[in-house]
């Protein structure tokens, strides 16, 4: 089954998403900021990334750009809070395949991952 890198500075969200994905048979890798995300992407080579935009140390947009520079084919879905439309547009222009608005429903996350891996 596919390996998914979950990147969010909120531990409870990482745990919630991890439980969802593990229940569906996915392998999960976690990072708590963009800097860790870039490092783990390079070393763990996940099949997809689900990444928050607003994080300490390195934000999700910067991490997205660094990951895409390393691997142009990287499959990334961004997590965003309501009201960040301009940031979402920048993420899509920078190579994100989709976005999920927080708070989210399980079905929306699973739909985004399924489409990403199709």
Feature roles, as predicted:
Residues 25-32, 40:
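Short hydrophobic/Thr-rich beta-strand motif most characteristic of the beta2 strand and flanking loop
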Residues 15-23:
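Charged docking surfaces used in two-component/phosphorelay signaling
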Residues 44-50:
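Active-site beta3 strand of CheY-like receiver
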């Amino acid at each position: 089954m596919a390996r998914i890198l979950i990147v969010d500075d909120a531990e409870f969200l990482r745990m919630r998403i991890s439980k969802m994905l593990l229940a569906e048979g996915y392998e999960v890798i976690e990072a708590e900021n963009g800097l860790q995300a870039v490092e783990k992407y390079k070393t763990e080579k996940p099949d997809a990334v689900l990444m928050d935009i607003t994080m300490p140390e390195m934000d999700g947009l910067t991490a997205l750009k660094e990951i895409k520079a390393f691997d142009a084919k990287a499959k990334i879905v961004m997590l965003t809070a309501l009201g960040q439309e301009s940031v979402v547009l920048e993420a899509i222009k920078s190579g994100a395949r989709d976005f999920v608005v927080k708070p989210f429903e399980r079905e929306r996350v699973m739909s985004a991952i399924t489409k990403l891996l199709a």
